[in-house]
A protein has these predicted regions:
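Single conserved hydrophobic/aromatic residue that forms the stacking wall/gate
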Residues: 1-13
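Structured-RNA-binding interfaces characteristic of tRNA pseudouridine synthases
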Residues: 10, 14-242
């Protein structure tokens, strides 16, 4: 969650008796989107859930919308209770720019082979050291992350990179996409991601993909924590089924 948005949410969810602090499931860079961000807060106020949802939305800008709400256990943490997070990166593979959705797509003019990209992405599945895929300013104490699945598919001129992991490093998804773009364009071999994992050197990898094509689409929690909310929400313009 970008800091200005976090502050804005705190201002919109106000309790007359005490200040409210919010926590979120995943932090997003400026320019990155979230269709299924989970935000939690504690309050002594008693309102029905419809009042919380509609009341909060009445104070939010059009770029932010609360979809639903739920009561959770006192020990629930949107961030630390999460079992996995799922991101989707949307690539518009065309030599001509899109005039309608430039803020929600990354246009790639090179013709991409999505099957090669998908094959290359499978080298990233599993618990591995993602030093080559983390930003230089990443403050995480370890580069070990467990990627549960990666799938690259094509829908006409759109290429979708769907990736799920227990957690992500700073710019990790965008750096992975940057590598897959070079593989799809034929400028790097399919084995390129595997080699980068062994190098453990960010400077040897591809350029970081822009933020505008990236969406946080899902957060899953342990089965012991029951939350009556969807764990996956696709961007509406894709027309995909949840």
């Amino acid at each position: 969650l970008h800091y200005p948005l976090r502050r804005q949410r705190q201002m919109c969810i106000r309790d007359r008796n005490s200040p409210i602090r919010v926590g979120c499931a995943g932090r997003t860079d400026a320019g990155v989107h979230a269709t299924n961000q989970i935000v939690e807060f504690s309050t002594n106020s008693h309102r029905d859930m419809k009042a919380w949802v509609y009341g909060t939305n009445s104070h939010l800008p059009e770029s932010i919308s609360v979809n639903c709400g739920a009561i959770v256990p006192n020990n629930f943490s949107a961030r630390h209770s999460a079992f996995s997070r799922r991101y989707l990166y949307v690539i518009y593979n065309s030599p001509i720019r899109s005039a309608l959705l430039p803020e929600y797509l990354h246009r790639e003019h090179r013709r991409l082979d999505h099957e090669k990209m998908d094959e290359a992405a499978q080298f990233l599945v599993g618990e591995k050291d993602f030093t080559s895929f983390r930003a230089s300013k990443c403050q995480s104490s370890t580069a070990m992350r467990n990627v549960l699945s990666v799938e690259v598919s094509r829908q006409c001129d759109l290429i979708l990179v769907d990736i799920t992991a227990n957690a992500f490093l700073l710019h990790m998804v965008r750096n992975i996409v940057g590598v897959l773009l070079d593989v799809g364009a034929g400028e790097k071999p399919i084995s390129w991601p595997r080699l980068l994992l062994t190098f453990k050197d960010r400077t040897k990898a591809s350029k970081t993909a822009p933020p505008n094509g990236l969406f946080l689409v899902g957060v899953r929690y342990e089965t012991a924590i029951h939350i009556d909310m969807p764990d996956l929400v696709w961007p509406h313009f894709l027309g995909l089924q949840h």
